[in-house]
A protein has these predicted regions:
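Short, well-ordered beta-strand segments in beta-rich or mixed alpha/beta enzyme
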Residues: 6-13, 43-70
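N-terminal first-folded block
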Residues: 6-36, 40, 44
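An amphipathic, aromatic/His-enriched active-site/gating alpha helix that lines ligand/cofactor pockets
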Residues: 27-40, 59-93
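Short alpha-helical
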Residues: 17, 28, 51, 73, ...
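Non-catalytic surface loops within mature trypsin-like serine protease
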Residues: 14-16, 62, 96-98
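Glycine-rich beta-strand-turn "strand-cap" elements at beta-sheet edges
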Residues: 1-6, 44-52, 80-105
Length: 105
């Protein structure tokens, strides 16, 4: 079977004083994101050794779904609310799914 899922890791460094506000805004966005038809999974993880570092693991059903995600009201709200909380610009890396098979998501 052809693999079509797109996995995006978004790396975020937050100001220490913004950790709780970032977590709250990001969890609200994640909960809404998993309801999008193009989103297979949306995980939020925080570094065990540095609470200011987060990774958002976003799994999209196809290459067009990230653009659709960025048009949603909840994403727009998230982006605006966390902008001042960032210690540095966020970065991202795109991956193609290898395992499990797309049907396993």
């Amino acid at each position: 079977m052809s693999q079509t899922l797109l996995v995006v890791h978004v790396q975020v460094q937050v100001k220490p004083e913004g950790i709780e506000a970032f977590r709250a805004a990001t969890l609200e966005n994640a909960r809404a994101s998993v309801g999008e038809p193009g989103v297979a999974r949306f995980d939020v993880v925080q570094a065990a050794d540095d609470p200011t570092r987060f990774v958002l693991v976003e799994v999209y059903r196809d290459a067009g779904s990230p653009a659709a995600h960025k048009q949603t009201a909840h994403y727009q709200k998230w982006r605006e609310s966390v902008e001042e909380l960032m210690a540095a610009p966020r970065t991202s890396t795109r991956f193609v799914n290898v395992f499990p098979d797309d049907r396993g998501w």
